[in-house]
């Protein structure tokens, strides 16, 4: 899953104005993937390209106990929440941050082949919806669009910035689904992932700077963001 991971970020920010900023939540949504692609550069976690391993994704994620086990994801969520708490002294913000990070494993469980573990052990889990594009594509788009629509409905501000963000999300997802498959999972592959995550995160920070919750009142609500 790719852009579907950002659905919990939109949901959290739409529900609570005390949640971290949208850009921060975008970091949290893909935090374990940021970590995965970083750790693969050092050979600590490992993946490879195996064409046809699933109908939609050629990645064989055969060793990723630190980022994509349930325990590993929980530890990343706790660590991210701790950073948010240190920066905000808000348990609400920290809790939403942890929720967004932890959601990554649950969403991956839906689409991955059995390559996810509970704590890095031999038993692996995954419902494998990547083998069923007729299900996986509407699922990912539906999650993202429903959460995005909820965020827009719960906030106010100019529509152009969030529309640009949505267009970027859909463009990157289309490239992921329908672009040419990578030949190798090396440094350039990780760099491409970092670039996509980075662009989307910058756009999310921009969007948050232009929007505020509808229940937020005051003369300067459009310029004062949490």
Please annotate each region the language model reported.
Residues 1-226:
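N-terminal membrane-targeting hydrophobic helices
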